[in-house]
Swiss-Prot record:
<dbReference type="InterPro" id="IPR014140">
    <property type="entry name" value="DNA_helicase_suAddB"/>
</dbReference>
<dbReference type="InterPro" id="IPR049035">
    <property type="entry name" value="ADDB_N"/>
</dbReference>
<keyword id="KW-0004">4Fe-4S</keyword>
<dbReference type="InterPro" id="IPR014017">
    <property type="entry name" value="DNA_helicase_UvrD-like_C"/>
</dbReference>
<keyword id="KW-0269">Exonuclease</keyword>
<dbReference type="GO" id="GO:0003690">
    <property type="term" value="F:double-stranded DNA binding"/>
</dbReference>
<feature type="binding site">
    <location>
        <position position="1106"/>
    </location>
    <ligand>
        <name>[4Fe-4S] cluster</name>
    </ligand>
</feature>
<dbReference type="GO" id="GO:0000724">
    <property type="term" value="P:double-strand break repair via homologous recombination"/>
</dbReference>
<comment type="subunit">
    <text>Heterodimer of AddA and AddB.</text>
</comment>
<keyword id="KW-0238">DNA-binding</keyword>
<feature type="binding site">
    <location>
        <position position="1115"/>
    </location>
    <ligand>
        <name>[4Fe-4S] cluster</name>
    </ligand>
</feature>
<feature type="binding site">
    <location>
        <position position="787"/>
    </location>
    <ligand>
        <name>[4Fe-4S] cluster</name>
    </ligand>
</feature>
<feature type="domain" description="UvrD-like helicase ATP-binding">
    <location>
        <begin position="1"/>
        <end position="401"/>
    </location>
</feature>
<keyword id="KW-0347">Helicase</keyword>
<dbReference type="InterPro" id="IPR011335">
    <property type="entry name" value="Restrct_endonuc-II-like"/>
</dbReference>
<protein>
    <recommendedName>
        <fullName>ATP-dependent helicase/deoxyribonuclease subunit B</fullName>
        <ecNumber>3.1.-.-</ecNumber>
    </recommendedName>
</protein>
<feature type="domain" description="UvrD-like helicase C-terminal">
    <location>
        <begin position="279"/>
        <end position="582"/>
    </location>
</feature>
Length: 1159
């Protein structure tokens, strides 16, 4: 009855020593007692394979490979001792919730905290730690008077209340999984299990007090217990504790066992020290042996040769990093005879690498096993249950409904879900619209039109969806006993036929050979039912709001995981560094060696801080390590990772993450470079494999095909490529799988993305109206000037975005224009002059108009939610303020409002605007002028055109020159040319102006009077545009003008002339602009009707048309593609623009004159 220690650094053969001793016992038939090999839970499968390989099947007649948990299960099966079921983590959290609620009156420190999401899990972790470290209620009570820290005292006191109540309730129906080893300890003492057996304990770094108790019992009754320790001679002989020593955690574990041996009179057999021999793992590999010896040694010896078994790679990003690993693995397997099972890839942040490894390894045909448990939270069954609750919780929100439908378990066809989604988004269906008695009869559903077949189908789909959900909601809504809520969940799953669909999926997965999916979906059903059953057992009689129960259930789902066993033996193992021990690894790739990742940076302290743990340790309550200690323990994990491979090691780190943010290399990289000064750091630019082997890019079909594309691009651009690529091309061209893809390469190389021409006849059919006339609005022609292709898609092909129930900027524009028009009509009906309107009167009229509109249109979006009702009130303020400013502007001048919302350009009413194209084609322009003001002055009539804008719009001559801002000038030209028809007299231009609808915020460092505020508002909302260069007309727009105007963009000098900052033009310049714009419209129309739909968006300064275009995904404009270039709007000076405009008009007139003379 003794304990023997087996010492050895990493690679010295400690595990081999254990298996050899077991083999020796079996071969020599020394006795017939059991031989036990005790290893951590995650290593049992691999260790059994090792024994099978080293000893053979006959080993298992006497040998058992166990973990502590597996030992407990075996003992309970053979000797009894556990009659109750082990509670799941979810049930445990439910029980904690119940215990906290029942004792909430005694909890002051945790009272508010207990309502926060995740608190139950935090308490669960503390209780689990108490149990693993044998902290009983009595031991907590014993330290009550010893704690001087008031906060810690209260914290421990309340933890004791929860802990004690938890244990009492737990033992009524279940056993806590953390109590298993305590029960095992008792059962071992009561039984004769393992008497005279020999035990080898391998691969452990440390033991919990529970595990130490088991070791103590085994040591007392077994012939001998052998325990391996990964430690060097220096640390072994050092009796003082050094937290910075990489082997400190091992030394600490050894000391704990020595203490147990001393206290229990357990014999100490002479230890085996394997450090004195050449490391078994590194025989013949001096480089890896050098890492093991010197990476954590100070001082260290440099390795003065060129390393061949170590590679250091600096990756551009994670994708580049894993692709380099994939190339290396493929090369080693193909050229060096390695098996995939000899290779492992590890990192410290597996979640960041999981998906990218899956994609790239699939491309390279590399079989792999991801050593990570599957989280069930994203499983469709969990999603279905969660979203069923969320639909009730979030009142049938779009997100919750379609999360439910897209789980795939509802039985609704995907095509119907897509059609329903469009309908839901267009009509903003949520809340009462889902739950109304008969959807088909609802006003919002029928609208003003007929009940179409499509709507009938939508109503049927909605009914099929809502019936089981509403039945479920009726059962759980409000406060109910948990057992009734659980019954409702089960009945709902049966109603929706979930279990039948899952069974169908499992059959499909089996046919496709997706073993991991088969395992996941086979277990998820029983896991969910177990969670529901445990909820009934643990808190079944408790009455809870459905929302509170859903919170508890969600935390239960979040904690559920499924462990996966490898489905094949020859696979690359991928996992976390912490789980790499216990494997025979010949080749290891450590990826993601970045600062703060490896070694991992400091972790969260948890409910009990480092200071709390230190204080508790001083009074006899010893718990797990502090975060400071855990940081040093990371060094040991790093040591194990660096020394686990026997033949080859590759270290790599990315320089940037997926978002392009830079990442720093870990101190590991700099340390390796110092130990191996001749080690060359490779990268995508400097890849030794490619430099040494020109065929290094020919690997697996998919990555080689990707390289072929790059090479063909180089060849197309007249760059040098290796001659063998022509043979590679021939191979792919003759391969059935890649033949079509090869053809697409040539299409891609010659792809210019410029947009084909469309025939004139087709364009006429697309653009002409019912009377076969070509009618365009001025704003549409501006859009063509911005980008011909975008115009063609929107107005030629009639492409539209999916309708969404929201208030968009165009909706706001229409709403504002309608309200301003209604306001003008109201003022006219009441016979009130604009100049007589007060701010209060403006507010009153606008408020009444908006209220009436919302009352008349009950289904308006502005009536739908509190958010939109708030917006309606805000629009009242904005429009009222704007109307007040407009009234003030009109009151300051002599111009009178002539027309508002004036439609012109209809080919059937005087043909107000007609463009005669060069091929005798006629184009009719339509438009709507927001407001026309007129002034009779000295026998002349002047007109002022005003356009209301809800967004920022400035007058820009550059944009006029390029045809991007011609609306106001076209309107002006139409009015002047047709003034007799419209105004019964000839008119002259007075101004063309933009007015911004806004309620500006006035900022000031000093207190302001009402008059000063009003002046600042007028200044902020001053109209922008062009004004006739005539002092009489300007003063007729602002009779109060003194120096500068608060109404228009004009200001006077002291001598009465206009300042240079004034936006004023002469009547002749107005004529020139009108003529230029008229010709520009003709030019645009001719270009458009010629079939030119080139992809050429404009770019003004740093703003490109594409930034606001809804059709970018269609044209796929990319400046990297040949012929994809912006039409750059060059910002020229005002003088240059005028010179260019006049020059173009003169040239055009000369050309017309020559043509007329020739005729």
């Amino acid at each position: 009855m003794s304990i023997r220690f087996v010492y050895g650094r990493s690679g010295t053969g400690k595990s081999k020593f254990c298996i050899d001793e077991i083999k020796n016992n079996i071969d020599k038939k020394l006795d017939f007692n059991k031989l036990i090999l005790l290893v951590p839970e995650q290593y049992t499968f691999m260790t059994e394979n090792k024994i099978l390989h080293e000893i053979g099947e006959n080993a298992f007649f006497r040998t058992e490979v166990l973990s502590f948990k597996k030992m407990a299960h075996n003992i309970f099966e053979e000797y009894g001792g556990r009659v109750k079921e082990i509670i799941k983590e979810s049930g445990r959290n439910m029980l904690i919730h119940r215990v906290i609620n029942e004792n909430i009156e005694f909890l002051d420190y945790f009272n508010r905290m207990s309502r926060e999401q995740g608190f139950n899990e935090i308490i669960s972790e503390v209780i689990s730690e108490f149990k693993k470290y044998n902290i009983s209620i009595d031991s907590i009570r014993a330290i009550d008077e010893k704690i001087n820290d008031a906060e810690l005292y209260q914290k421990v006191k309340e933890l004791m209340i929860i802990y004690e109540a938890f244990n009492l309730k737990m033992h009524e129906n279940y056993i806590d999984g953390d109590d298993e080893l305590t029960l095992l300890d008792k059962k071992l003492l009561e039984s004769s299990a393992y008497v005279d057996s020999e035990v080898w304990i391998d691969e452990f770094t440390s033991f919990t007090p529970q595990q130490l108790d088991i070791i103590k019992v085994l040591a007392k009754r077994c012939r001998r217990v052998n325990i391996t320790f990964c430690i060097d001679n220096k640390s072994l002989n050092n009796n003082s504790e050094d937290i910075t020593d990489v082997f400190n955690i091992i030394k600490s574990t050894e000391n704990k066992i020595l203490k147990i041996m001393k206290e229990n009179n357990i014999a100490y057999d002479k230890p085996v020290n394997l450090n004195n021999a050449i490391p078994y793992r590194f025989k013949g590999n001096l480089e890896l042996d050098h890492i093991e010896k010197y990476f954590f040694s100070y001082p260290f010896n440099e390795y003065d040769k060129n390393p061949e078994s170590i590679t250091l790679y600096k990756a551009s990003n994670i994708y580049d990093e894993i692709e380099r690993v994939s190339k290396s693995i493929t090369s080693l397997v193909r050229e060096n005879g390695y098996r995939y099972r000899d290779i492992s890839v590890v990192c410290r942040n597996i979640d960041d690498y999981e998906k990218i490894i899956s994609v790239i390894f699939k491309d390279y045909n590399i079989p792999y096993f991801l050593d990570k448990k599957i989280q069930l939270l994203s499983n469709p069954l969990i999603v279905l249950i969660s979203s069923a609750f969320e639909i009730l919780l979030k009142n049938w929100s779009y997100e919750s409904v379609f999360k439910y439908l897209k789980s795939g378990l509802t039985g609704i066809d995907n095509s119907y879900i897509d059609r329903l989604e469009n309908f839901i988004l267009e009509y903003g269906v949520k809340g009462y619209k889902w739950t109304s008695k008969e959807i088909v009869n609802e006003k919002w559903f029928r609208g003003n039109g007929e009940l179409t077949d499509d709507k009938v189908l939508i109503a049927e789909i909605m009914e099929e969806i809502r019936y089981p959900l509403m039945t479920f909601h009726n059962k759980v809504n409000g406060k109910h006993k948990v057992k009734d809520i659980c019954s409702a969940i089960y009945e709902f799953l049966v109603d929706v036929k979930v279990f039948d669909r899952i069974n169908e999926w499992i059959k499909n997965f089996e046919e496709l050979g997706l073993e991991d999916k088969v395992k996941e979906y086979s277990q998820v059903e029983s896991i969910v039912i177990d969670i529901i059953d445990q909820a009934v057992d643990v808190i079944g009689e408790e009455r809870l709001e459905y929302s509170e129960f859903f919170r508890i259930l969600s935390s239960g789902f979040a904690n559920e995981e499924i462990g996966i066993i490898p489905v094949a033996l020859d696979q690359v193992n991928i996992g976390d560094i912490a789980r790499i021990k216990g494997r025979d690894v010949k080749v290891l790739y450590i990826v993601g060696i970045n600062d703060g990742v490896l070694p991992a940076s400091k972790k969260e302290e948890g409910l009990l801080s480092d200071r709390d743990r230190t204080t508790l340790g001083e009074v006899g309550i010893n718990l797990s390590s502090t975060t400071r200690n855990k940081v040093f323990e990371e060094q040991y994990l790093l040591y194990m990772a660096l020394t686990i491979s026997s033949e080859y090691l590759m270290l790599s780190y990315p320089m940037a993450d997926f978002e392009g943010k830079s990442l720093r290399p870990s101190i590991v990289i700099s340390r390796i470079k110092k130990i191996f000064p001749n080690l060359i750091e490779e990268s995508a630019i400097y890849d030794l494999k490619i430099l040494e082997n020109k065929f290094g890019k020919i690997i697996a079909p998919i990555p080689t095909f990707n390289e072929l594309i790059i090479s063909m691009r180089k060849d197309f651009d007249k760059e040098y490529i290796e001659p063998y690529w022509s043979e590679v091309y021939e191979w792919f061209k003759n391969n059935d799988e890649f033949r079509d893809k090869v053809k697409n390469i040539f299409k891609g190389l010659s792809y210019s993305n410029i947009g084909d021409k469309v025939s004139k006849n087709k364009l006429r059919k697309l653009y002409q109206n019912d009377l076969e006339k070509l009618v365009f609005s001025v704003s549409k022609l501006e859009k063509y000037a911005e980008c011909p292709f975008s115009y063609f898609v929107q107005y030629g092909l009639k492409a539209k975005n999916r309708k969404v129930y929201e208030f968009t900027p165009p909706d706001l524009g229409s709403f504002v224009h309608e309200m301003l028009d209604s306001f003008t009509n109201k003022v006219r009906e009441d016979g009130v002059l604009w100049s007589d309107l007060s701010n209060e009167k403006c507010k009153e009229i606008i408020s009444n108009l908006i209220d009436k509109k919302l009352m008349d249109e009950s289904n308006s979006i502005l009536n739908s939610t509190k958010k939109f009702k708030y917006l309606a009130q805000r629009f009242k303020r904005v429009i009222s303020k704007s109307v007040s400013v407009i009234a003030s502007q009109i009151g300051k001048g002599e111009f009178e409002v002539f027309k508002t919302e004036f439609d012109f350009g209809s080919y059937s009413s005087g043909e107000a605007i007609t463009l005669d194209l060069n091929d005798n084609e006629k184009v009719y322009l339509q438009g709507r002028i927001d407001r026309i003001d007129k002034l009779d002055l000295d026998g002349e009539t002047y007109i002022r055109i005003i356009d209301y804008k809800t967004g920022a719009k400035k007058f820009d001559l550059n944009e006029i020159y390029y045809g991007l801002q011609v609306q106001l000038l076209v309107y002006l030209d139409a009015l002047i040319k047709n003034s007799k028809y419209i105004l019964d007299k000839q008119v002259k231009p007075g101004a063309i102006l933009y007015f911004k609808i806004d309620d500006p915020i006035i900022k000031s460092k000093k207190e302001m009077t009402d008059e000063e505020v009003e002046k600042e508002v007028l200044s902020a909302l001053k109209m922008k545009g062009l004004v006739l260069k005539d002092a009489r007309v300007v003063k007729a727009m602002d009779k109060d003008i003194e120096g500068y105007s608060l109404v228009i963009p004009a200001s006077f000098k002291a001598d009465g002339g206009f300042k240079a900052t004034s936006d004023v033009v002469t009547e002749e310049e107005f004529r020139i602009l009108r003529e230029y714009v008229n010709r520009k419209m003709i030019e645009i129309c001719e270009e458009m009707l010629s079939g030119d739909i080139k992809i050429q968006p404009t770019k003004n300064s740093n703003i490109a048309h594409c930034e606001y275009c809804d059709f970018s995904s269609i044209c796929q404009f990319d400046t990297e593609i040949k012929d994809n270039k912006y039409k750059i709007i060059i910002n020229k000076s005002t003088n240059d623009i005028w010179n260019n405009i006049k020059k173009e008009i003169d040239n055009s007139n000369k050309l017309i004159k020559v043509e007329n003379e020739e005729v």
